[in-house]
Amino acid sequence: VPLPTVEGSPGTVPSTVREEEDGYVLYGRGATDMKGGVAVQLKLAAELTAQDTDYNLTYIFYDNEEVASELSGLARLIRNHGELITDADFGVLLEPTNGTIEGGCNGTMRFFVRTRGLAAHSGRAWRGENAIHALAPALAALASYEPKTIAVEGLDYREGLNAVQISGGVAGNVIPDAAAMHVNYRFAPDKTLDEAISHVREVFAGYDLDFVDLSPAARPGLDTPLATSLIEAVGEEPQPKYGWTDVARLSEI
């Protein structure tokens, strides 16, 4: 289970140190994601260690889940102590899911669509080439794009292709000579990473794409005996995981 880290989800979760305790209940930032998962594993470790079980269980706690991939604690563990994981038959990542099972996960990639122009004074704009204007066809492609819902092993994964940032320009009287649009693509686990890259290159044909994050999807894999027994114990229909999680790292082993 990922340990709570300071850098997780920058810009989406307000920073605060305020927390409240009410008996066994903790309220505060990170209480659900991921202190809740940590607490569940610690409780299970304490209780199941004192019992006879049919399974050999390994509990893994790691840092840096939601930051740069090269900092991932799970990736570091796989590199340095892969024997703890590579022999596993089944893995559960304790993301907050409202008590249901979410199988696999969508893949994600981030990239910049970059344009170049020619700087000029805006009073003599005809002497320049506006790099921001050159992004217009790329924005139009996004506005008309229809994301798919794709069934994979009985679960419906919703895809998404969205601009998340745009940057360009240096001053209010200068025609910009460079611009960039930051795009996020969430793709279903029916695609490999290479297939997803080929798709966005087709959507943005003619543009330079600068990829900054490439994370593969993971298929559900809920048809194994261990998975089906867990589904029966939970008693709820499994759902797809729309976001990306470290389940994808486990599925690559």
Question: Each predicted region: which residue ranges?
Answer:
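Metal-dependent amide/peptide-bond hydrolase catalytic core
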Residues: E7, P96, I101-G104, R110-I253
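Residues at secondary-structure transition points
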Residues: E21, T32-K35, W126, G221
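Short pre-catalytic strand/loop immediately N-terminal to key active-site residues, enriched for Gly-Thr
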Residues: D22-D33, G235-P240
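Flexible, glycine/proline-enriched loop segments at strand-loop-helix junctions
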Residues: G28-T32, D63-A68, A120-E129
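Acidic/histidine-rich catalytic neighborhood of metal-dependent amide-processing enzymes
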Residues: K35-N106
